[in-house]
UniProtKB/Swiss-Prot annotation:
Belongs to the SecA family. The lineage of its organism: Eukaryota, Sar, Stramenopiles, Ochrophyta, Bacillariophyta. One of its GO terms (biological process) is intracellular protein transmembrane transport. GO terms for cellular component: chloroplast stroma; chloroplast thylakoid membrane. GO terms for molecular function: ATP binding; protein-exporting ATPase activity. It is a peripheral membrane protein. PROSITE patterns: SECA, SECA_MOTOR_DEAD. Keywords: ATP-binding, Chloroplast, Membrane, Nucleotide-binding, Plastid, Protein transport, Thylakoid, Translocase, Translocation, Transport. Has a central role in coupling the hydrolysis of ATP to the transfer of proteins across the thylakoid membrane. InterPro entries: Helicase_ATP-bd, P-loop_NTPase, SecA, SecA_CS, SecA_DEAD, SecA_motor_DEAD, SecA_preprotein_X-link_dom, SecA_SF2_C. This is Protein translocase subunit SecA. It holds the Pfam family SecA_PP_bind. It is found in: Plastid, Chloroplast stroma; Plastid, Chloroplast thylakoid membrane.
């Protein structure tokens, strides 16, 4: 077997022997019937149960998956895709370029690891991709006798629980992480949805592990909030001037009040001290200024239905379930004049960094991981392997154009679009904000250019995948914020799937009324063009329009069915069969046109990518460039920049900016090696800063994570225990030991009130002087009193209802465990803020945080025991 000519990395050559084994099995597998191939799954499962060695099954499992893929989808894994699968199975990240078939690659290790019957999770970034991949790739798994699950945002509890039981489950990062937190707040095992973790494949791993790593996932509960202070602070902020009353640190998104600013605010508010702990104004003021000076509408958030919705700066998508913390969200609400929602306190939280490390086996795939490989390896212990492309890369990355100011840059982009549009070459323009995307859209309108707009606005988000999929159509111009539509392939000449569904939807809705039937041939000439099938198409359409069940469908019902048609393997209703036939006929026709359009666009140079600003990370820039040149297609990319871009403004050296100002003419761009190197250096500085921030978060959260794991482990044991008698007795005995230790402390007053308060009764034997009692005798006596009190309480509950005491014990332990953990999280958050300042005193903040967090955790355990035993002994039945 010859080696793949594109494999240059000697590290990948280690997989060649396995590739040879997989290919050698192909001929024999092709001779098997479908049933015989399916039975291979049960044979491999049996072998695994006997040998417990998954590595021994790798070659055969991969070969079986490839054959099943070819029989169900007509897709045969390339050798480089086999390498990608082997890399994933070895617990690494596969970097595969756009269009190289990452979704198909994941089926190889997923099938192999599903043979253990321990479950496989394939994690994607949104519900659409999870559903799409489960529908398409699920055909392979079902063919091989495996069941697949799908978790969606609006899924009910029982359905969610059932889908997690599948051998392979498709789910979003958001859903699986929040399900984990909710499971660890459950009051009984029947409320738990997740099985034990086994193997996880993360798609778009850089988006989840890096872009979203700094945002912890939080389940919160509302707390009383002083709404009026946010409103007043927002009004005060309007009277303050930048660089006079406050300074803006744009790099770190921070605000620093000047002495003049502090005095001015105290004068306006008529208070003596903004920092007064009894009536603090400073947090409200700082949040209000941040909301005004650092957070902008249609850039960092949008206003929708009288709510502030955050816009993800990396993807351009809205995040309706996220809120800024520390009062910032309320400050933005006050600024925009929308209803201010209550502050919240954390009931449970985890970062993606620590959540995904819970999986015993973890891997990921993306098109852009190499630039962040150090972070992947240091934090997640995930090496990155760059997988060669199946075909040579023909994309041309042209040098950046840099202009003097933003106006000149945007004008140049519009002119470039006008020039390219004349050739009919498709254009995809990536912008960094909603505001910029809409401004460019208005500019293109002035140039009389038609375009499709995709940004975080709700009316655009609904059509995200469709808009991105059609970005490769002849003559199309698509404006998209950052990486919106990620995961959707842009096919040169257009994507027939979306196009055909839209066409059929329009046909069905238009002709549902019988009065239109006489005009069928003239209004819909496309059907006549379908040569020998056109008459049959019209005949089926005519019968469909006379089907009462179809006519009862609303327009929304038709659209819903068309979107879900892939999930219906064998339609059982007549109108469904008819619609599926019409869709197939249209697809055949459109595929012929698409083949022609594909060749035309390739001859024009493929998709032309225009970047409107360098992002803070080279990885994000590469993601935009990677939208063109898929699977050996031609493509071109160029970035248009200005000296007013945030990267230049915040991280470019003053020497560079002065040089550029002198070199640049008003409306002409500049290309230079110095410029490129300077931009790369600026991006590297930002990447290092952002990495330090994520590493800082990880180091601190890792300490909390160890405590979280202990609490969740103990909590699960509580749920699984049939009886908690031993736990209650152990807690009670430890409480007594704690009290005796206190009583023996010379500084502690010698009184029996603490003991009597615990037992809620007067203990006769303690009337004598406590100093005269021996510790052992006192402990023995109190133990006996506690055991007696416990048995009395058990009897009291059992008389009322058999088994009631067991339920009560579980409830009270879980209640205090959860309350104490919630309070612990608040204290940890305050501690993290406080220790940061200690570096100024030449102390190590991380070391001190670790030490004090440990003490807080120990105190939490003591508090749980004392409160629990006290309330248990004081409890009574109403």
């Amino acid at each position: 077997m010859l080696k793949n000519p594109f494999i240059k990395d000697s590290g990948l050559n280690q997989y060649q022997p396995l590739i040879n084994q997989i290919n050698a099995l192909e001929t024999n597998l092709k001779t098997l019937t479908d049933t015989e191939l399916r039975n291979k799954t049960f044979e491999l499962k049996k072998r695994y149960q006997e040998e417990q060695d998954l590595n021994a099954l790798t070659a055969e499992a991969f070969a079986i998956t490839r054959e099943a893929s070819f029989r169900t989808l007509g897709l045969r894994h390339f050798d480089v895709q086999l390498i990608g699968g082997l890399v994933l199975n070895s617990g690494k990240i596969s970097e595969m370029r756009t269009g190289e078939g990452k979704t198909l690659v994941a089926t190889l290790p997923a099938y192999l690891n599903a043979l253990t019957d321990k479950g496989v999770h394939i994690v994607t970034v949104n519900d659409y991709l999870a559903s799409r991949d489960q529908i398409s790739m699920g055909q392979i798994y079902r063919f091989l006798g495996l069941d697949t699950g799908l978790i969606q945002e609006d899924m009910a509890f029982l359905e969610r629980q059932q889908n997690y039981k599948a051998e392979i489950t498709y789910v979003t990062n958001n859903e699986v992480a929040f399900d984990y937190l909710r499971d660890n707040m459950a009051s009984n095992l029947s409320q738990v949805v997740l099985p034990p973790f086994n193997y996880c494949i993360v798609d778009e791993v850089d988006s989840i592990f890096i872009d979203e790593a700094q945002v912890p996932l939080i389940i919160s509960q509302a707390v009383e909030t002083c709404i009026d202070k946010y409103i007043v602070a927002a009004e005060v902020a309007e009277y303050l001037e930048v660089n006079v009353h406050f300074k803006v640190d744009e790099k770190n998104r921070n605000i620093i009040l000047t002495e003049q600013g502090t005095a001015q605010i105290e004068k306006i508010l008529q208070v003596e001290d903004l920092y007064n702990p009894n009536d603090p104004w400073i947090p409200y003021i700082l949040s209000a200024i941040k909301a005004t000076a650092l957070f902008f509408r249609n850039v960092h958030y949008i206003v929708q239905n009288n709510q502030i919705i955050i816009v993800d700066e990396f993807t351009g998508r809205i995040m309706p379930d996220r809120r800024w913390n520390e009062g910032l969200h309320q400050a933005v609400e006050a600024k925009e004049g929308v209803p201010i929602r209550q502050n919240t306190e954390t009931a449970a939280s985890i970062t993606y960094q620590n959540f995904f490390l819970l999986y015993p086996k973890l891997s990921g795939m993306t098109g852009t991981a190499k630039t962040s490989e150090v972070e992947f390896e240091k934090i997640y212990n995930l090496p990155v392997e760059e997988i060669p492309t199946a075909r040579p890369n023909l994309r041309k990355d042209l040098p950046d154009f840099v202009y003097k100011d933003s106006l000149t840059k945007w004008t140049a982009i519009a002119r470039e679009c006008k020039s390219i549009a004349n050739t009919k070459q498709p254009i995809l323009i990536g912008t960094t904000t909603v505001e910029n995307s809409e401004m460019l859209a208005d500019l293109l309108q002035e140039y009389q250019l038609s375009y499709r707009l995709l940004n975080a606005k709700p009316e655009n988000v609904k059509r995200e995948s469709e808009i991105v999929a059609q970005a490769g159509e002849i003559g199309s111009i698509t404006i998209a914020t950052n990486m919106a539509g990620r995961g959707t392939d842009i096919i040169l000449g257009g994507n027939t799937t979306f196009k055909v569904r839209k066409q059929l939807y329009n046909i069905l809705v238009s002709y549902k009324s019988k009065t239109n039937l006489t005009k069928l041939n003239t209004i819909f000439p496309l059907a006549i063009d379908i040569k020998f099938t056109s008459q049959k198409f019209l005949s089926v359409l005519n019968s469909l329009l006379n089907d009462p069940k179809f006519l009862s469908l609303s327009s929304t019902g038709i659209l819903k069915f068309l979107n879900e048609i892939d999930q219906i393997r064998i339609p059982k209703i007549t109108y469904q069969c008819s619609i599926k036939f019409l869709l197939n006929e249209l697809s055949k026709f459109e595929k012929k046109n698409q083949t022609i359009d594909n060749k035309i666009v390739k001859n024009l140079g493929g998709l032309y990518i225009i970047g409107t600003e360098r992002n803070n990370s080279r990885r994000i820039d590469n993601q935009l460039r990677g939208r063109c040149g898929r699977q050996g297609d031609p493509g071109t990319s160029r970035f248009f920049l200005s000296l007013e871009d945030s990267l230049f403004r915040n991280f470019g050296s003053s020497k560079l900016q002065n040089f550029m100002q002198n070199q640049l003419l008003d409306d002409l761009p500049l290309e230079s090696n110095l410029l490129t190197k300077s931009l790369d250096a600026a991006q590297k500085r930002v990447e290092e800063r952002d990495y330090d921030g994520r590493k800082y978060l990880f180091d601190y959260d890792d300490i909390l994570n160890k405590q979280r794991n202990i609490v969740y482990y103990e909590r699960r044991k509580l749920l699984e225990s049939q009886s908690l008698r031993e736990t209650i007795l152990a807690y009670g005995e430890q409480v007594i030991k704690d009290i005796i230790t206190l009583l023996k402390d010379p500084k502690f007053p010698k009184t029996n009130s603490m003991i009597e308060e615990l037992f809620k009764t007067r203990l006769v034997s303690l009337n004598s002087d406590l100093n005269s009692l021996d510790s052992f005798e006192l402990k023995t006596y109190l133990f006996q009193e506690f055991w007696l009190s416990y048995e009395t309480k058990v009897l009291e509950f059992e008389i009322c209802q058999t088994g009631l005491i067991r339920s009560f014990e579980r409830t009270i332990i879980l209640y205090y465990t959860d309350i104490a953990w919630k309070e612990h999280l608040q204290k940890i958050a305050l501690l993290r803020d406080a220790v940061g300042w200690r570096s100024y005193g030449q102390r190590n903040p991380l070391f001190e945080f670790k030490e004090e967090a440990y003490n807080l955790f120990q105190n939490r355990n003591i508090t749980i025991r004392h409160l629990l035993i006290r309330d248990f002994l004081h409890s009574f039945i109403l």
